[in-house]
A protein has these predicted regions:
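Low-complexity, S/T/G/P-rich flexible repeat/linker segments used as non-globular hinges
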Residues: 131, 135-155, 259-282
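Short coil-to-beta transition motif at edge beta-strands of beta-rich domains
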Residues: 120-133
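Short, structured beta-strand/loop micro-motifs enriched in basic residues and often containing a Trp
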Residues: 92-113
Length: 282
C-alpha cells in the first residue's frame, strides 16, 4: 500500500519566515527614512549656504562703493547711519560727465559717458558734482550734493557728443561754473537692516530716498543676530565714529526652514570684511 507524502511548511517555519520578513522590511524602511532625512537636510544646508553667499555678494557690492572722510560731513561721507544690525548709506547708482556749459539750475551729462544700472530718477536720487578748488563751495576738491528735481532726455550735447541727460537741480552759482568733463555721481539713500516678517527674521533693503517699504533680500536668518555689522578704523579697531570708518565686517547667520538630521534647524554663519572706497590699505 502506497503512503501519500504531503509537502509544505510547519507552523513554526511560517512564523519564522514572517518574523524575518518583518525585520528586513523594518530595517529597509528605517534606512529609507534615514536616507530621505539626510538628503533633505543636505539640500536645505546647500540652499542655506547658497542663500548666504548670494546675500553676502549683494551686501559687499553695495558697501564696497562707500567712502568716509575723517572729520567730513555731507557729501564727503557715504555712511549716513551706522548701527549694529542696520545701515543707512548713500548708494552709487551711476556716473557721467558734464557736456557743454550748465546753467544755474541744470546739468547735462553725456549719454555715452553715463555708466549705471538705470537712468537718474527725480525726487529720490541725488547728484554729487565734483568741485575742484572752488571758493563758492567753501572748500577745495569736494563732492557737492544736490537733489535732482527732474530728469529730461530730449536734448543733445554740443557738437558730436550725442544725446544727453539733463538734470534739473536747485539753483546754485557753483553749478553755472562747472566745466565740460566734470564728473557727476548719481546716488540714492538706501537702508540695509535685519527685520521680522511672518515670524521670521530677514535681511531687507529699501530706498530711503523714495520712501519704499522694506523688501527681503536674504532669509530666513537667525532672530536677533542674523545680520551683524562691525565698523573698523584705519588701524582695524572697532569705531563708532562714522567719519573714521575704513572697513566694515559683515556677519550673516542663517537657519534652515525645517529640521536637519537632528531635532532642530541647521544654522550656518558667513563672515566677510569689505574695505571702503579710497581707504588707505596698510
Amino acid at each position: 500500500m502506497l503512503t501519500r507524502c504531503r509537502s509544505g511548511f510547519t507552523l513554526a517555519e511560517v512564523m519564522i519566515a514572517v518574523g524575518l520578513t518583518a525585520v528586513v522590511a523594518g530595517t529597509l524602511y528605517r534606512l529609507l527614512m534615514t536616507t530621505q532625512r539626510t538628503t533633505r537636510a543636505q539640500a536645505q544646508r546647500v540652499e542655506l549656504q547658497s542663500n548666504l553667499r548670494a546675500g553676502s555678494l549683494i551686501v559687499l557690492s553695495e558697501l564696497r562703493e562707500l567712502s568716509a572722510a575723517p572729520g567730513g560731513s555731507g557729501a564727503r561721507n557715504d555712511i549716513l547711519v551706522a548701527g549694529s544690525t542696520a545701515l543707512v548709506y548713500r548708494a552709487m547708482r551711476g556716473i557721467g560727465f558734464v557736456c557743454g556749459t550748465p546753467s544755474a539750475t541744470s546739468i547735462r551729462i553725456t549719454r555715452g559717458s553715463f555708466t549705471g544700472p538705470r537712468d537718474p530718477q527725480a525726487d529720490g536720487d541725488e547728484a554729487l558734482v565734483f568741485i575742484e578748488d572752488s571758493a563758492a563751495a567753501g572748500a577745495e576738491d569736494i563732492w557737492l550734493g544736490m537733489k535732482i528735481v527732474s530728469v529730461a532726455t530730449g536734448a543733445s550735447c554740443p557738437g558730436a557728443l550725442g544725446p544727453g541727460i539733463t538734470l534739473t537741480v536747485p539753483a546754485s552759482p557753483v553749478v553755472a561754473g562747472l566745466e565740460a568733463g566734470t564728473p557727476v555721481r548719481i546716488t540714492e539713500a538706501m537702508e540695509l537692516r535685519l527685520y521680522e516678517s511672518e515670524g521670521r527674521s530677514w535681511l531687507g533693503a529699501r530706498s530711503v530716498s523714495s520712501g519704499e517699504t522694506i523688501q527681503p533680500l536674504v532669509g530666513p536668518l537667525t532672530p536677533g543676530s542674523g545680520f551683524r555689522l562691525e565698523y573698523l578704523d584705519a588701524a582695524g579697531r572697532p569705531t563708532t565714529d562714522r567719519t573714521s570708518i575704513k572697513s566694515i565686517r559683515v556677519a550673516l547667520q542663517g537657519t534652515t526652514q525645517g529640521g536637519g538630521t537632528g531635532d532642530g534647524p541647521v544654522e550656518e554663519e558667513l563672515l566677510a570684511q569689505v574695505v571702503l572706497r579710497n581707504a588707505i590699505r596698510p
